[in-house]
From Swiss-Prot:
Name by which UniProt lists this protein: Acetate kinase
Site (Transition state stabilizer) location in chain: 180, 241
Organism: Clostridium beijerinckii (strain ATCC 51743 / NCIMB 8052) (Clostridium acetobutylicum)
Manner of cofactor binding, per the entry note: Mg(2+). Can also accept Mn(2+).
Gene that produces this protein: ackA
Top EC class of this enzyme: transferase
Enzyme Commission code: 2.7.2.1
Length: 400
């Protein structure tokens, strides 16, 4: 069976076609600038030259139609007919409290996703548009929604509730939801395989550290706490997001400094985090370069804050679970920034964590590598995430 995985943004679309008989990616691509000038598709197939198509795309339906054409293209495609696509798995950011697992998409599901839009106004609308576009072009192909929030629905009330008036939860659904669930679930499962143990017997801290950052306590294969909250703004410092701050700062900026709510929202989401502290940008390679070449004090401070916050969260989740057996680092920074891993892991011997600094210094770990010492009671491993494969697996499970 071949599963097409779709991830729609507001003006972009990522896709991957996966052969589930061997879990190999047949083709992957990115469509950019949908609905604006300069629309472009870039498709990569193993053993073939990169295929680039520049053509106007007025909406996501146009984009998905182009994707399907490229997949069956005589010279650049990988399948002879769309009939070879057994199912489509859609990444959906927010499933609210209704969906604790992936679900086959029908009209009831689409209606529910629409209701969750108020919880994820930036992300769910393009997800829904992508689903509707696929349904129009592939009406007989089963579709599955795989939610970023679903994995975290196992969190207990004491972890997901905010200390706000209770009615804000019961009436307005204000609570911690958590995100990156597909990634956390995937790397926790891979960690259990590497340790040759049943995941139900393990306490794992998974650190998804990219432009967005979230850390999760996975106890017995279930998420019991996570750093992102009601929105993906909460938690650890991120590329341009602040992470957790004193909520009174918002009041101060509005009342004392005269900012509008929209301006504060823009500051917290787009002008803070790594960008805000360093003044350089969101790309961690630029931060590293500023430290190594210029000894830039703000770049160094950015690294120190980042590592400190990750360390603090690992310690907190070890306390929550009553210990920790393994720690996983994944996503762009987690996989390729040894400076952050070393800052997060040094002086943690009291928890049984002993990091091998020489192994850790590898910038390009590739398919995964243990960076803890042989004597370490806690296994620390870098595992590249594969959210697309996880989405495809969950899709196949529901439609086979």
């Amino acid at each position: 069976m071949k599963v097409l995985v779709i991830n729609c943004g507001s003006s972009s679309l990522k896709y991957q076609l996966i052969d589930m008989s061997n879990e190999e990616s047949l083709a992957q691509g990115l469509v950019e600038r949908i609905g604006i000038t300069g629309s472009i598709l870039t498709q990569k197939v193993e053993g073939k030259d990169k295929y680039v198509v520049e053509t106007p795309l007025k909406d996501h339906q146009d984009a998905i139609e182009l994707v399907l054409k490229c997949l069956v293209d005589e010279n650049h495609g990988v399948i002879s007919s769309m009939d070879e696509i057994s199912a489509v798995g859609h990444r959906v950011v927010h499933g609210g409290e209704k969906y604790a697992t992936s679900v086959v998409i029908n009209e009831e599901v689409i209606k529910a996703l629409d209701e969750f839009t108020k919880l994820a106004p930036l992300h769910n609308p393009p997800n829904i548009i992508g689903i509707n576009a696929c349904k129009a072009l592939m009406p007989k192909t089963p579709m599955v929604a795989v939610f970023d929030t679903a994995f975290h629905q196992t969190m207990p009330e004491k972890a997901f509730m905010y200390a706000l008036p209770y009615e804000l939860y019961t009436e307005d659904h204000v609570r911690r939801y958590g995100f990156h669930g597909t990634s956390h679930k995937y790397v926790a499962g891979e960690m259990a395989k590497l340790m040759n143990k049943d995941i139900s017997d393990l306490k794992i801290v998974t650190c998804h550290i990219g432009n967005g950052v979230s850390i999760t306590a996975v106890d017995g294969g279930k998420s019991v706490d996570t750093t992102m909250g009601f929105t993906p703004l909460d938690g650890i410092i991120m590329g341009s997001r602040s992470g957790s701050i004193d909520p009174a700062i918002v009041t101060y900026l509005v009342k004392e400094k005269g900012y509008s709510i929209d301006e504060v929202n823009d500051i917290l989401n787009k002008k803070s985090g790594v960008l805000g502290i360093s003044g350089i940008g969101t790309d961690f390679r630029d931060i590293r370069s500023a430290v190594e070449n210029d000894n830039d004090p703000r770049a160094l401070l950015t690294m120190d804050i980042f590592g400190y916050q990750v360390k603090k969260q690992i310690g907190a989740y070890a306390a929550v679970m009553g210990g920790v057996d393994a720690i996983v680092f994944t996503a762009g920074i987690g996989e390729h920034a040894p400076e952050i891993r070393s800052r997060a892991l040094t002086n943690m011997e009291f928890l049984g964590i002993e990091v091998d600094l020489e192994k850790n210094e590898s910038h390009n770990i590739g398919d995964g590598m243990e960076i803890s010492k042989e004597t370490s009671k806690v296994k620390v491993v870098v595992i590249p995430t594969n959210e697309e494969l996880m989405i495809a697996k969950e899709t196949l499970e529901l439609v086979k």
